[in-house]
Amino acid sequence: MSDDESMVLNFSTDTAGIQRADKVTGGRWKDRRKLQQRLGGREPVKRRAEGGDKERGDKRAKVDTGNAQEKKNIPKPVSKADVNINSQIVSSLFTSNRAKQTSENKNKHNSDDKVVPSNAPLTDDSFEGLGVGSLVVSHLENKMRIQKSTSIQKVVIPQILQNADKTDFFIHAQTGSGKTLAYLLPIFSAILGMGDHIDRKSGCFALIIAPTRELASQIYHVTTMLANCCHYLVPCLLIGGERKKSEKARLRKGCNFIIGTPGRILDHFQNTKVIKEQMQSSLRYVVLDEGDKLMELGFEETINQIMEIVNSMDVITRKYPKLPNRIVHLLCSATKNNEVAKLSKRSLDNYKVISIGGKKDTMMDNTSVPDQLLQKVVIAPPKLRLITLAGVLDGIQKKPLDAGSVAKRTIVFLSCADSVDYHFEVFSGNDGLYKNLVGDSVRVLSKGNKILPSIKDEELPGIICYKLHGSLSQQMRTMTLKHFATDSEQTKGKHLILFCTDVASRGLDLPDVSTVIEFDPPFAVEDHLHRIGRTARAGRSGEALLFLLPGEEEGYLDYIQKYHPKGWDLLDAEKDVLIKAFNDIDVARNDKEIKSTGKTFEWDTNATTWHLNVERRILENEQFKEQATKGYISHVRAYATHISAEKQYFNLKGVHLGHLAKSFGLRDRPKAMGMNSSKDANGNERSKPKKENAKNKMFRMARMAAKQSADEFNY
């Protein structure tokens, strides 16, 4: 190859190597943009005038030089202890409150009318004349101090004794009229009238079903007292919360009366063989007490299963020929509604309605409150609810003890268990000045506890506070109720205040309850009648007070007017309650050590100081704050569960929730209100639960089903 034909290649290389474009990362986007422009050979455009830059000066970069003096200026995280609770904005109790619409009492109580107790024992009717056996009559008069029958007992006892072979019975009467003895006395008379030798092995003669554990326990107590006239008759109590093993042991020993709640009785029917053996040849009476509550609590299916088992038993008349030749069904209720009518059709056969003051062959509702009951109504704005309750309790505290009474008893009904816990703490836990008597559910106030304005420094308050709701253990509920209902040296001369849910509203015969306060409106008018029925029992006088909010709730008065033919007194929250309680006294602040000078202040100043004392207690005590928050949230949720017929009066949209939070001692509305909120009651983020696998879910559902079948409804 010649030189001319050779190929020449010309390569040009850069000795510095190939430069890659720098990538700018980190920092603010404006800083990255300016640096990118400088790397590209461009200067960032200055939009601000030079004069303005000079006036403002260059912004100093934040550089950590380790200087201790500069670090002092760095703000620290605020802890709960550093918060000055008195520097918060506190809303006034007496401003921005909604005015009440009811200016005139359309159903005014006439104090001049002569009152004849409608549920009192009759003066001219003895039990012996009604057909009750002489042994039982003697026991009633000498041991139980019961001399005369009531109106409902006068009608019911002869009917059951004479017509038990022919018909079932629906017993409808006012609360406190003596329905329990009305069906127990003829049953005892029929058993004792046989003349045969009877003992606990003779079989079960009566099955009595009650909706709540407390009512079942009370019926058991009354039955035990009656059975003391003949020691060979033995009752047995079957309720949730007790050990089934112990109940089975009692059933094996034998019993003549079985009293219990639906869930536990059905559980024994399904799992305890001896209970059917006890009833097979002897069962003659089945009683459903408080039928409306049985339906309301969802026991319809349970009752149906029990009735199927009972009705499948063969009645062997040759063993006890003097007893009815059939199983007699009795349904008792103080109210009549569609649900009770439904229960009566399913459980009663060819039944007879026994009612005082109405037609016996109709289901027309003629329910009314006892004539001797004095009903009062107070319309209080949301912010004034707590302070008004304090004023009402203070007014009761200042009243003298009724003649013949050992202690004053007041019941305050609330809508939910959390609200009960909160109000119990408000009125009993002031600075720890109390002593526990029964667990943490019964507290006697100590000297220096001035939770009510009329209590003086140098005197003992003379107050015992109780709390009762379905979340307490069965043993605690039983002991609390027993302590409240029993006259003893601990309760003598004192004011007993029971804060409770509707668990204590049905059937309980609590002695000498002078006042019932419905602080939260009832969920149904039937609950209203049963609540106020805890007072004015068996001919005794009593008072009931209903709290309502201004606005839509005032229409509730027209709704319940037909149940109060004697009318009511309409109270003004400020004039009739607060001024009487807080005028001409000195309510000291709980955050200052100031000795009382004897100087008195205006009533509104004292009321505000009292409420601020509660608020400061909540802010200083994290556990108390949690109770207040839970009480508020549960109250709001419970408020939304009123029955549809009463929604027009109790609509959550018409309630100022911020003002309502004030009545729970909260200066701010809790952040966590929804059931599915991502934050807890204190505003902290909730941790997401781990996803459950199929196997664990199956076992959890099985355990839940087993528990529901074994446990009683926790009401």
From Swiss-Prot:
Listed Basic and acidic residues bias regions: 20-29, 40-73, 101-115, 682-695
Top-tier EC class: hydrolase
**GO biological process terms on file:** endonucleolytic cleavage in ITS1 upstream of 5.8S rRNA from tricistronic rRNA transcript (SSU-rRNA, 5.8S rRNA, LSU-rRNA)
Q: Which GO terms describe its molecular function?
A: ATP binding; ATP hydrolysis activity; RNA binding; RNA helicase activity
Which CDD domains does the UniProt record give? DEADc_DDX31, SF2_C_DEAD
Query: Which Gene3D superfamilies does the record associate with it?
Result: P-loop containing nucleotide triphosphate hydrolases
Q: List the disulfide bonds.
A: none
Chief place where the protein resides = nucleus
Report the InterPro entries cross-referenced here.
Answer: DEAD/DEAH_box_helicase_dom, Helicase_ATP-bd, Helicase_C-like, P-loop_NTPase, SPB4-like_CTE
Residue limits of the Helicase C-terminal domain?
Answer: 400-586
Catalytic activity of the protein: ATP + H2O = ADP + phosphate + H(+)
User: Per UniProt, where does ATP bind?
Assistant: 173-180
* Locus of motif Q motif: 125-154
PROSITE patterns per record: HELICASE_ATP_BIND_1, HELICASE_CTER, Q_MOTIF
The short sequence motif called DEAD box sits at 289-292
Ranges for the Helicase ATP-binding domain? 160-354
Q: Which GO terms of the cellular component aspect does the record hold?
A: nucleolus
Q: What else is known?
A: Present with 1460 molecules/cell in log phase SD medium.
- This chain belongs to which protein, by name? ATP-dependent RNA helicase DBP7
Organism (species):
Candida glabrata (strain ATCC 2001 / BCRC 20586 / JCM 3761 / NBRC 0622 / NRRL Y-65 / CBS 138)
